[in-house]
Amino acid sequence: MASVQQGTPAETNGAASANTIGVENPATGDLITTIPVLGADQIRAMAGRAREAQPQWEAIGFDGRARVMRRAQKWMLDHADRVIESVVQETGKTHEDAQLADLGYTVSALGFWAKEAARYLADERVPSWNNPVAAGKKLIIRYAPVGLVGVIGPWNYPIANSFGDCIPALMAGNTVILKPSEVTPLSSLLMAEMMRECGLPEDVFQVATGDGTTGAALIAEVDCVMFTGSSRTGKAVMKAAAEALVPCYLELGGKDPMIVCADANLERAANAAAFYSMNNGGQVCISVERCYVDESIYDEFVQKVTDNVRGLRQGEPTGVGTVDVGAVIFPPQLDIIDEHVRDAVAKGAKVLTGGHPRPGPGRYFEPTVLVDVDHSMKCMQEETFGPTLPIMKIANAEEGVRLANDSNYGLQASVWTSDVEHGEALARRIQAGVVCVNDAQINYTALNLPMGGWKTSGMGTRHGSGGIRKYTKIQSLLITRRALKREPFMFPYTARQTRLLRAFFKLVYGRGKRD
């Protein structure tokens, strides 16, 4: 991987930055390569080229843009091993996690937006009958591209949650500059290579490598920002976007609760709890981060989950099927995970399995199950983002809902019960942007279903109509086809004209029911 290219000369403005960042393999600690930290002048030059390229990209229409996306879909499948290996090397995640999300989600999204973008962004006719003054006029809502979109991606899914956000923005007719995480930039550069090979015009999609200063410079140059990351960084992004007076959309932290009712399918719920808390090393924005279990099934549930988690294989992913849980991708995250576990133990929690950073090369935290937890502990209140599962005993589902809502976060939640009608009723009371019944995380694959956070978990949505319309400007059109030389309300004002208009208002609006 030492020969990885940091973009084309066009993407780096023909010169490497004086500053570089090393990209490591978290599974081994080995240096893969270095990437340049692009500065404000380079970002400004990239933005200028993107703005020049945008009108032509918009002009080729939905069909032309869709052809590029479908070619990219085929390219990813034809080069699946290379795509997966790129993700695995810079994240230390398992081949299976990389295939399921970074590859599987992205090829699905390329096809979905290629097919659905035109429908979501088609002109909408609006009825004019509700106001006599506008009666007979042609009213249209039009969705126009914002122009240049800046996407600031996270490190946990360097393709799915970085390039994945670029796809609808591109299909809407925008140009895009993607600033990937400095920890995992290589897969984004691979996506830039893919798009060039698939016929995307020059400068329509560019990758800006660098650190937080690069992201700040990007926000100052674009017309719209999409950010995925922590709530703390999201607030800084929102502040910078406000200074630039550009819209921003945020997918931020989560502390997703799982409520297991007394009548739940215990085997399925236990398997799901183990998987959806540990997949991708627990580094999933919609990971199960806290679990509330009815006291009548608590002991059996805890035993099943603990047995499952204790048997998970962790280590360097040397091939398919070699490990179940990979590395901790972001270096500071290892300390956060450890801090949350130590805080819980100090306050009375018990570790049933795991509980420690794993010694040796690479960054790992043992898959961990905690019990005897409560809401005084960080592991139940703050985003852990690691392979841990705190399980709390509850009296009933009502207590579970109350505790689920006792959080600053509201990204996702799940309810597990054999009574799906009761489960849906509980779901509607949980303060989260997405709630699943007898499932978790799978909603992310339903690309026609909006996904977004409440509370401090974000603003705006991915997927569905809102997932592409956020990258547009709404233009309203009113067209008068048969016009009078002079409307009755135009100058000059006369007493007779005023009386007639008053009578007209009374005739039209005065027949409503009186309280």
Regions found by a protein language model. Give the residues of each.
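N-terminal Rossmann-like NAD(P)+-binding subdomain of aldehyde/semialdehyde dehydrogenases
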Residues: 1-137
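Short, well-ordered beta-strand elements within core beta-sheets of diverse protein domains
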Residues: 31-38, 53-59, 151, 258-260, ...
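ALDH superfamily catalytic-core signature
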Residues: 224, 232-374, 437, 498, ...
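Rossmann-like NAD(P) dinucleotide-binding subdomain of oxidoreductase/dehydrogenase enzymes
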Residues: 128-268, 322, 394
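Residue-level signal for inorganic ion chemistry
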Residues: 29, 65, 87, 110, ...
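Conserved C-terminal structural/oligomerization subdomain of aldehyde/semialdehyde dehydrogenase
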Residues: 25-34, 357, 364-515
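Short loop/turn microsegments at loop-to-beta-strand junctions
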Residues: 18-21, 288, 411
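Structural signal for hydrophobic packing residues in well-ordered secondary-structure cores
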Residues: 54, 58, 73-76, 80, ...
